[in-house]
Amino acid sequence: MVATNRCCVFALLFALLLVHSLTEAGKGKEILGKIKEKIIEAKDKMKAGWERLTSQSEYACPAIDKFCEDHCAAKKAVGKCDDFKCKCIKL
């Protein structure tokens, strides 16, 4: 009889542990979902900022000539940085 009661107690504890684990796993998914949303939001902001910067290459011209070249290539021209300004020369 004592062995049967121990089995019931262990089965009850195991069931409670299982329910608790499943509950915590659900909370973990919520937290991971929120983190994933924030990462996606940050990625979108960085991508939009990068596109804005490359579309206005004169802001990056003193630092990186490649921005000016890419900006002017989109306009089918040759780009050259001159005194903090990107100048596009049509061919």
UniProtKB/Swiss-Prot annotation:
GO terms for cellular component: extracellular region. Residues 26-42 form a propeptide. It holds the Pfam family Scorpion_toxin_alpha-beta. Keywords: Antibiotic, Antimicrobial, Disulfide bond, Ion channel impairing toxin, Neurotoxin, Potassium channel impairing toxin, Secreted, Signal, Toxin, Voltage-gated potassium channel impairing toxin. It is found in: Secreted. Transmembrane segments: none annotated. Disulfide bonds join 61-81, 68-86, 72-88. Expressed by the venom gland. The keyword Signal applies. InterPro entries: Long_scorpion_toxin_alpha/beta (IPR029237). The keyword Hydrolase does not apply. Its main location: secreted. Residues 1-25 form the signal peptide. One of its GO terms (biological process) is defense response to bacterium. Residues 58-91 form the BetaSPN-type CS-alpha/beta domain. One of its GO terms (molecular function) is potassium channel regulator activity. It comes from the Eukaryota. Belongs to the long chain scorpion toxin family. Class 2 subfamily. Almeida et al., 2013 suggested naming this protein TstKMK, where KMK represents the first three N-terminal residues of the mature chain. However, Batista et al., 2007 identified a mature chain that begins two residues upstream of KMK. The full peptide presents antibacterial and cytotoxic activities. The synthetic C-terminus (AA 33-76) inhibits voltage-gated potassium channels Kv1.1/KCNA1, Kv1.2/KCNA2, and Kv1.3/KCNA3. This is Potassium channel toxin TstKMK. It comes from Tityus stigmurus (Brazilian scorpion).
